[in-house]
Amino acid sequence: MGNNLSVILITKNAERTIETTLKSVSWASEIVVLDSGSTDNTLNIAKNYTSKIFISESWPGFGVQRQHAQNYATNDWILMLDADEQISEPLKNSILQAIKGPDCIYEINRISIAFGTVIKHSGWFPDWIMRLYPSKLTKYDDALVHEKLIVPDGMACKKIEGLLIHE
């Protein structure tokens, strides 16, 4: 596919949502799945979209697991997703434009949906999260939970158009 983008997912027992997620990023050059020991159909579903599936049953926490997964990626750009998130078409188009430009960390507006309703209160909307970034210049911190992308000094951060849908 030649767009220099690696999409990364860390998973465990995500059979209910992972196919929708993978369909939404099937246009990416590379999809990397790092699984933490799923006992459901997660891995069989993932095999329909990528051969880059790795297993790490030890659980060092979200930050370290994301770092581990990033080590398997081979492209210049990383899009880090959860197994219950999908890329909207406008976001896809924005990503494809962004990765043609200079190195920058991009913040994506994530909308969270619960029981069929977009959550627009309690700080959940807008929910700008850093998920698109140059693979060689940054990574996630070591946090067990609520991990954050490390922003190098002088690195530009920009907002990108389109929505990341979290169900």
Segments and roles (model prediction):
Residues 2, 27, 51, 73-76, ...:
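Active-site acidic short loop of glycosyltransferases
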Residues 4-6:
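Cell-envelope/extracellular polymer assembly enzymes that use nucleotide-activated donors
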Residues 8-27:
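Short, well-formed alpha-helical segments that are part of the catalytic scaffolds
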Residues 15, 24, 35-44, 58, ...:
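A conserved acidic beta->alpha catalytic loop
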Residues 16-19, 40-49, 90-91:
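Acidic helix N-cap motif at the loop->helix transition within catalytic regions
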Residues 27, 48-50, 128, 153:
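Short, structured coil segments at secondary-structure junctions
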Residues 43-72:
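Conserved donor nucleotide-binding strand/loop of the catalytic core
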Residues 63-70, 77, 81, 88-167:
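Catalytic-site signature of metal-activated, phosphate-bearing donor transferases
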